[in-house]
Amino acid sequence: MANKITLTAQDGSTVEFYDEIKAQGGVKDVYFSTDKTYVVAFYRKPINANDKARINDIVNVHRNRIFTNDVVGHYWSAFFAWPTNIVEWKGLTGIVMPFYDKKFFFSGVADSWPFIKNGQEKNGKWFSSAKLINRFVPADQKGSFLDRLHMCLKIARAMRRLHAAGLAHSDLSYNNVLVDPLSGNACIIDCDGLVVPHKFPPEVVGTPGFIAPEVLATKALKIDDPKKNLPKIETDRHALAVLIYTFLLNRHPLDGGKVWDVDDPQKDDDMRYGSKALFIEHPTDKTNKVKVDQLAKSQLPQGDPSKMPYTICGPYLKELFDKAFIDGLHNPSVCPTALQWEEALVKTCDLVQPCQNPKCEAHWYVFDNTTKPRCPFCGTEYKGQLPILNFYYAPSHGKYISENYRLMVYDKQTLYKWHSNNLVPCNEKTSIEDKKPVGDFHFFNGQWILINRRLPDMYDATDKKPIGIGQYVPLAEGRQILLDKGQGGRLIVVQLVKS
């Protein structure tokens, strides 16, 4: 039986853990608390004064600013495994962190499954590469395409909050994100390595494949060299774009067929992700195009962009991928912000449609804006009427203008306050009241209908009549429905695709 260690933490509280290493990271050893509600991670080597000051700021300054004692502060606690305390033991510095939520550990995996076992962490790497997810992850652990969109939304939202605090992660990658594709959740880990304003950043520059090209280009320079590009918010943006691309498409955006240095694999990697970085789906420069005949069977179909192009992620994400990997790959100021990713992912989640093939592994797909929509994952064409709601709003009660925002309708789909009014947020600030559905959609007696549940202003602008709470309106082609007549209120115009 391991010995119980009792320490007094920096804030005077008692920390108790067993003297038995339960997990090891790149620079830390992890011990479990006696009640298994938290872990204590000790750096293997003594850390310098700068790192101590930086970690102290993370634990005692920024934690209190982000995790405020209110609804919004509690909301963020699910998004980060944030250090809560600092301890010293045997001349080494340790950080106290909450135990990961149980949803971030595999469960329900058959004992006969040879690869992943129950109790293993759901490290993001399992779900980012086609080879890993196709060979090693059981089908019932993969989640749907919509779940993966939600997962990416949580990551983008977490990074937006981090950046708003002036912090950068410095090593954002699939290794430092725990994910649960079954519930669409994600948690940012290794928060002790954050880049804190006015403090020297940690010496780690990131994980290969996620390091921004401009950082990789100067990695050989000493850390105090003014020409060295160090991790910061702008470099996080590159890593975030790569992470979203890999989680949705299960391939790396820069891993194409071009070999930049045939003699030195390290130089080849440095060029591939650094000075010569080139998007594998670049529309005009095919230099780094994927050579499908060189892919392993387990990398297909996801590894073949001609079969599953990035455009299957929808127009909002396609635009941001272009900015990240074409316009901004060697021009960091153009790379999309975490907020832009968050907003695009919210809109994309409203563009999804359930696949009509019950055996489809993805279950959902993004509407492709054609008259014959089909699931890109299994090839099943949509059959029947497909209603699309186009959102319009009137700035200062003027003429209604398009928002370039749509909502796909499917049976039992719900309408929320953030759909009816563009001033209502869909994020950590959404009130409990605004999280309640205000309407729902059904296929009833051969037609699609919208039932009004909680919108006092709903009005059929086509037939010039109010739609009271509890009443419904048919979704006919071209019908205009006012959802909210107040400031920010939206008008929807119905479009019907018949296939």
Which role does the model predict for each range below?
Residues 322-352:
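Terminal C-lobe "cap" of eukaryotic-type protein kinase domains
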Residues 150-152, 159-181:
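Catalytic-loop of the protein kinase fold
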Residues 78-147, 200, 205:
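Conserved structural core of kinase catalytic domains
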Residues 2-54, 74-82, 88-90, 433:
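ATP-binding glycine-rich phosphate-binding loop
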Residues 189-195:
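Activation of the activation-loop gatekeeper triad in protein kinase-fold domains
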Residues 459-499:
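C-terminal boundary/linker segments immediately following FHA domains
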Residues 231-237, 244-318:
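Conserved C-lobe activation region of Hanks-type protein kinase-like domains
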Residues 201-225:
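Conserved activation segment of eukaryotic-like protein kinases, specifically the C-terminal portion
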